[in-house]
UniProtKB/Swiss-Prot annotation:
This is NADH-ubiquinone oxidoreductase chain 2. The gene is MT-ND2. The chain crosses the membrane at residues 3-23, 59-79, 89-109, 150-170, 178-198, 201-221, 237-257, 276-296, 326-346. It comes from the Eukaryota. It comes from Nyctophilus arnhemensis (Northern long-eared bat). GO terms for molecular function: NADH dehydrogenase (ubiquinone) activity. The lineage of its organism: Eukaryota, Metazoa, Chordata, Craniata, Vertebrata. The keyword Transmembrane helix applies. Keywords: Electron transport, Membrane, Mitochondrion, Mitochondrion inner membrane, NAD, Respiratory chain, Translocase, Transmembrane, Transmembrane helix, Transport, Ubiquinone. It is a multi-pass membrane protein.
Length: 347
């Protein structure tokens, strides 16, 4: 892609996200979402093949429908309250419609069907943007309207997302689809605590993004998209492969890695608010995510495939200059909780 075109696309996407995050007027928020959506579509079709085109079309149709629902909710609220302000979302029907629109943009169940298909059809770099940066704008709106949303609908969506994020990843061999289902599950965890403690949702987001960036960046270094090819890289780049596996276990929430911290705190917050049954079900469903990540770790590290490669480890590893952020991301993704366990008890 032409560097000038790429820079323009990235500037538009960043501007759209910041416009959404800084606006309190529904029309400007809608404009920001549209800028964001139209900017990322060229990134989804970088490879110019039918699969990327299909993924971009699915993404466009889903996001356009979500934007239509968002504008419809804003207009319904305008008719009842006379305000375009985000803080004046007082009509119950408008609140439910807005929640559905934002859930569709985030890929929350039952509006999750586009996430695995779109992620599978696009390059790893575009998948990284889709599962990290594209979550910021909808989550910022969810944060702003959290006191005005329907608790029952949020909890149903959260439970469904955690369940589907676990079940969907069980039989997958494609790493991009596994990351997509993991994203659905993480969005469910964020929604479960949104109305009780919105700052806890932000903590989960702050830890989810470095873990996802680390995993995708290491997969890009390895040029790996399937569990089978990940197994072959053990002979070539054992250190990088080992870090990928540890980061994936952190994404699954294995203690004492960083990914366990938000789950621990969210369950603690739910128990404080007398949601013991809900937190128990969520903890059990989280085991599904941990199971398929553990299975990937087992098949990759403990079952080595026969290879004709006599030189087990490459003598020289070409480290991309664009990924100088990786060491910091790896530390955040794996070692925050083991190094500073007191963060878990800070209020």
């Amino acid at each position: 892609m032409n560097p000038m075109t790429f820079s323009l696309i990235m500037m538009t996407m960043v501007s759209g996200t910041f416009l959404v995050m800084m606006s309190s007027h529904w029309f400007l928020i809608w404009v920001g979402f549209e800028m964001n959506m139209l900017a990322i579509i060229p990134l989804l079709t970088k490879q110019h093949n039918p699969r990327s085109t299909e993924a971009a079309t699915k993404y466009f149709l889903t996001q356009a429908t979500a934007s239509m629902l968002l504008m419809m909710a804003a207009i319904i609220n305008l008719l009842y309250s006379g305000h375009w302000s985000v803080q004046k979302l007082i009509n119950p029907m408008a609140s439910v419609t807005m929640t559905m629109a934002l859930a569709m943009k985030l890929g929350l169940a039952p509006f999750h069907f586009w996430v695995p298909e779109v992620t599978q059809g696009i390059p790893l770099s575009s998948g990284l943007i889709l599962l990290t940066w594209q979550k910021l704008a909808p989550l910022s709106i969810m944060y702003m309207i959290s006191p005005l949303t329907n608790l029952n609908i949020l909890m149903i969506m959260a439970l469904l997302s955690i369940a589907i994020g676990g079940w969907g990843g069980l039989n997958q061999t494609q790493l991009r689809k596994i990351m997509a289902y993991s994203s659905i599950a993480h969005m469910g965890w964020m929604m479960s605590v949104l109305m009780y403690n919105p700052n806890m949702m932000l903590l989960n987001l702050y830890l989810y993004i470095p873990m996802t960036i680390t995993t995708f960046s290491l997969l890009m270094i390895n040029s790996t998209t399937t569990t089978t090819s990940l197994s072959y890289t053990w002979n070539k780049l054992p250190l990088i492969t080992m870090i990928i596996l540890i980061t994936m276990l952190s994404l699954g929430g294995l203690p004492p890695l960083t990914g366990f911290l938000p789950k621990w705190l969210i369950i603690q917050e739910l128990v404080k608010n007398n949601n013991i049954i809900l937190s128990t079900v969520m903890a059990l469903l989280a085991l599904l995510n941990l199971y398929f990540y553990t299975r990937i770790t087992y098949t990759t590290s403990l079952t080595l495939f026969p290879t004709m490669n006599n030189t087990k480890i490459t003598w020289q590893f070409k480290y991309p200059k664009q990924m100088l952020y990786l060491p910091l991301m790896i530390i955040i993704s794996t070692l925050i909780l083991p190094v500073s366990p007191m963060t878990a008890i800070l209020e």
